[in-house]
From Swiss-Prot:
Disulfide bonds: none
The protein's name in its UniProt record: Glutathione S-transferase 1-1
Enzyme class label: transferase
Residue ranges of domain GST N-terminal in the record: 1-81
Superkingdom of source: Eukaryota
Keyword vocabulary terms for this entry: Transferase
Protein task: Conjugation of reduced glutathione to a wide number of exogenous and endogenous hydrophobic electrophiles.
SUPFAM superfamilies in alphabetical order: GST C-terminal domain-like (SSF47616), Thioredoxin-like (SSF52833)
Biological process terms in GO annotation: glutathione metabolic process
Oligomeric and partner information: Homodimer.
Gene designation: GstD1
Coiled-coil blocks: none
Residues annotated for glutathione binding in this entry: 51-53, 65-67
Length: 209
């Protein structure tokens, strides 16, 4: 069984948990207390010198960055390739959505909310505009689509639903974006492990109360 270093409230960690559920892989979950500096201990730095979560250790093979872990789990353990198809064009669209999630959507969350939550900084209206722009892009991608990349559930949906659910508990108004809202309601029903994702979201919500 693969060791999985994580925090339940972390959106990237939750995307891996849902992906593991989708491919039927059990994870040996190991809570890492970042506030206590457990990620900076020599034994963890040996595993991941970048000292980030999530981190997966599968039979001695260590990997971090959630979207890389998602793809690895599907390629190694998926019974089919439906979550990450081998077709170059289909895969390219999924990759684009994953990079969009990492570099634009989730990044906009981190840039706006983290300074307020962890450094008690005032809200930055310019950073909030970046969130709105990211949701406008996602809304456009989802025009006429039930899924984020193609016509069935993929790792792109799983990564995005982890991010979008985090925006929801932070109080962002997702319902303003009709296509995102429709996709999100469907994703809640069809994404394996959604319940555990939502439990993690509620744990994260305490930072916004």
């Amino acid at each position: 069984m693969a060791d999985f270093y994580y925090l339940p409230g972390s959106s990237p960690c939750r995307s891996v948990i849902m992906t593991a559920k989708a491919v039927g892989v059990e994870l040996n979950k190991k809570l890492l207390n970042l506030q206590a500096g457990e990620h900076l201990k020599p034994e963890f730095l040996k595993i991941n010198p970048q000292h980030t979560i999530p981190t997966l250790v599968d039979n001695g093979f260590a990997l971090w960055e959630s979207r890389a872990i998602q793809v690895y789990l599907v390629e190694k353990y998926g019974k089919t390739d439906s979550l990450y198809p081998k077709c170059p064009k289909k895969r390219a669209v999924i990759n684009q959505r994953l990079y969009f999630d990492m570099g634009t959507l989730y990044q906009s969350f981190a840039n706006y909310y983290y300074p307020q939550v962890f450094a008690k900084a005032p809200a930055d209206p310019e950073a909030f505009k970046k969130i709105e722009a990211a949701f406008e892009f996602l809304n456009t991608f989802l025009e006429g689509q039930d899924y984020a990349a193609g016509d069935s559930l993929t790792v792109a949906d799983i990564a995005l639903v982890a991010s979008v659910s985090t925006f929801e508990v932070a109080g962002f108004e997702i319902s303003k974006y009709a296509n995102v809202n429709k996709w999100y309601e469907n994703a809640k029903k069809v994404t394996p492990g959604w319940e555990e994702n939502w439990a993690g979201c509620l744990e994260f919500k305490k930072y916004f109360e």
